[in-house]
A protein has these predicted regions:
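N-terminal, post-signal peptide beta-strand-biased segments of exported outer-membrane/organellar beta-barrel
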Residues: 17-126, 477, 503
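Residues that define the transmembrane beta-barrel architecture of outer-membrane proteins
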Residues: 46, 97-102, 168-172, 335-339, ...
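Residue-level signature of outer-membrane beta-barrel architecture
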Residues: 56, 107-110, 174, 178, ...
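Repeated loop/turn-to-beta-strand initiation elements of outer-membrane beta-barrel proteins
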Residues: 62, 112-115, 183-186, 350-353, ...
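Transmembrane beta-barrel strands of outer-membrane/channel proteins
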Residues: 64-72, 117-121, 188-192, 355-359, ...
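Structural signature of outer-membrane beta-barrel domains
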Residues: 71-75, 120-126, 193-197, 358-364, ...
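Extracellular loop and loop/strand-boundary signature of outer-membrane beta-barrel proteins
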Residues: 87-92, 157-162, 324-330, 376-382, ...
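Outer-membrane beta-barrel "beta-signal"
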Residues: 488, 492, 543-558
């Protein structure tokens, strides 16, 4: 049992580690994006990230932009497994907030050439705090109730769990933009991505409330299992010794005798007969049944009892191991590089068309394992966690009015990226089995200049994920999204601009149905049927909502 549970727990923790893998490229890299998400054809300083080829349209001199975002993310999984606390609608909330989400851009423009640098959280920053713990773990511990109910009358459980993941994936981008002619500009560069992730937490104080032979108060499950395991071991040894004694009587020719006949024949004393009868009564046999038994049958009962108690002693050892306190403290680090190409077209003075292609970033993270009492993160082991290649397109139009209209597309090549995902057997999973299509985002927005100093903006972005139901899990899920952003820009001086933005992101609720097999075998009374319990049909419902506040300062040295 312990091997199976160890494999299950290890897979759950590895899956938790993959919560930051895949579908994680961030596009909210500036306050300008937060206030108007269609930035792919921007000709501003945040074009370092969104439209680097368009930097040739900047005025000569140094251009800088410093941004920060405050990200508030609320995630929740609802699970209807009947033994979970809170069933049939057990809620598992998780907070993923970031008070620091910085972005810095710098560009030096001289005539037809611009040199640029960008520093951004490309693959995620902040932490996810599982306030109730990991739901997949709690399902395991809730299975203590059906496992121990028949023999011990257990009706409830409790567990203290706390897990927190943090992720910091910073990108350092360098590149050169050059104007080929007044219409066409090109960009070539690359981005170094450095990643650090941590997984810390623990499981403590797993309690159950046995009522059969106990007072129904909650007590530590590991202590309970240790005590009953020792009792089962002692009983197994006693019945094994008794079976050996009965075998000697059978060998002496008393196999077809009853206990009364064995005593009358002088094979055993009245006290020994009482011990044999007491041992059979403890197995649930009535006096009439005991009186009718032949010694061959008594031997069978004793052997079966010895096997039964030995098996339950092993089961209790597994429960003791499962319900002991555990801690986890792991850090993963790694780095990767991706080339970036860009193109900008200025058409008919009013139209801008931009194209950018980012190659996939190959990321291999190494475990630095300080504490791992789950056996999931071997120290020094490596795991892949790539960032997918991305193609972005943008179009903007600025007519004679004070409005600029923009639209954009981001297309992620998820199916060809190596996210390091594995199945329950620890084998690599092909993306085609869990990702039906590449994900994409469509955006549209507008900016309106009230006067020479103040600009207002708003926009919308639709995010479509391409994952299949098999990708979704209690820990890692990807959902379609709707983003609305608004804000403005204020020119403090001709060379200093303040950007302020706010975005609300709503995700489409999704769900998954699957069979849950009881993780802990049932302890049954002696002689009961040991048929395997049918799996329970379980439904998970995933939901999420985000809010982003952003502020940025743009500065020009002419």
């Amino acid at each position: 049992m312990r091997r199976e549970l160890l494999t299950l727990i290890a897979m759950l923790l590895l899956e938790a580690g993959m919560a930051h893998a895949g579908i994680m490229t961030n596009v909210n890299q500036s306050a300008g994006f937060v206030r108007m998400p269609a930035r792919n054809a921007t000709l501003g300083i945040d074009g370092v990230h969104y439209n680097p080829a368009g930097l040739t349209r900047l005025t000569n001199g140094w251009h800088f932009s410093l941004n920060n975002q405050f990200v508030f993310s609320d995630r929740q999984v609802e699970n209807d497994y009947s033994y979970l606390n809170g069933a049939p609608s057990a809620m598992f909330p998780a907070d993923a907030n970031a008070a620091l989400f910085p972005g810095f851009f710098a560009a030096y423009k001289i005539n037809k050439t611009a040199l640029s640098f960008g520093f951004n959280p490309i693959g995620g920053i902040g932490g996810t705090d599982y306030r109730r713990g990991l739901p997949a773990f709690e399902m395991i511990f809730s299975d203590l109730v059906p496992a121990l109910q028949p023999a011990f009358g257990v009706t409830g459980y409790s567990v203290e769990m706390a897990f927190k993941e943090t992720s910091a994936s910073f990108g350092y981008q360098l590149g050169v933009s050059h104007e080929i002619n007044p219409t066409l500009s090109l960009f070539g560069g690359g981005r170094l991505v450095r990643v650090k992730r941590t997984y810390r937490g623990g499981i403590n104080d797993i309690l159950i409330n046995p009522t059969t032979g106990y007072d129904g108060s909650y007590r530590r499950a590991d202590v309970f299992a240790a005590q009953n395991g020792a009792s089962f071991t002692s009983k197994s040894q006693s019945y094994s010794s008794a079976a050996a004694g009965v075998q000697s009587l059978i060998s002496a020719g008393a196999g077809n005798f009853t206990l009364a006949q064995v005593q009358s024949a002088g094979y055993i004393s009245s006290a020994q007969r009482a011990q044999y009868e007491s041992a059979l009564a403890n197995l649930g046999l009535s006096p009439a049944q005991i009186a009718a038994l032949r010694m061959n049958q008594v031997h069978t009962y004793y052997e079966d009892a010895a096997t039964y108690y030995a098996a339950n002693a092993d089961l209790m050892a597994g429960i003791q191991w499962l319900t002991g306190d555990r801690e986890l403290d792991v850090t993963q680090t790694g780095a990767g590089f991706a080339p970036i190409l860009g193109l900008n077209l200025n058409l008919a003075r009013n139209w801008t068309v931009a194209v950018k292609y980012e190659f996939a970033t190959r990321l291999e993270l190494e475990n630095d394992t300080r504490v791992d009492q789950f056996g999931s993160y071997p120290d020094g082991a490596n795991v892949r966690s790539d960032l997918p290649a991305m193609l972005s397109l943008g179009v903007s139009y600025s007519g004679k009015s004070r409005c600029v209209f923009s639209s954009g597309l981001n297309y992620y090549f998820d199916r060809s990226a190596n996210y390091g995902l594995v199945n329950a057997a620890g084998e690599a999973v092909d993306n085609s089995d869990i990702i039906d299509a590449n994900s994409f985002e469509l955006a549209a927005g507008a900016e309106y200049s009230l006067n020479k100093s103040l600009l207002l903006s708003a926009g919308y972005m639709l995010g479509k994920t391409g994952v299949s139901e098999d990708f979704q899990s209690l820990i890692r899920f990807s959902l379609d999204s709707h983003t609305v952003g608004f804000g403005g820009q204020y020119l403090i001086t001709p060379n200093i601009a303040l950007n302020i933005g706010c975005s609300f992101i709503r995700y489409r609720e999704d769900g998954k149905e699957y069979d849950h097999y009881q993780a802990v075998p049932t302890v049954l009374p002696f002689g009961s049927s040991s048929d395997t319990a049918a799996p329970a049909r379980v439904t998970d419902t995933y939901s999420r909502s985000d809010m982003i506040l952003a502020v940025g300062i743009d500065y020009i040295i002419r």
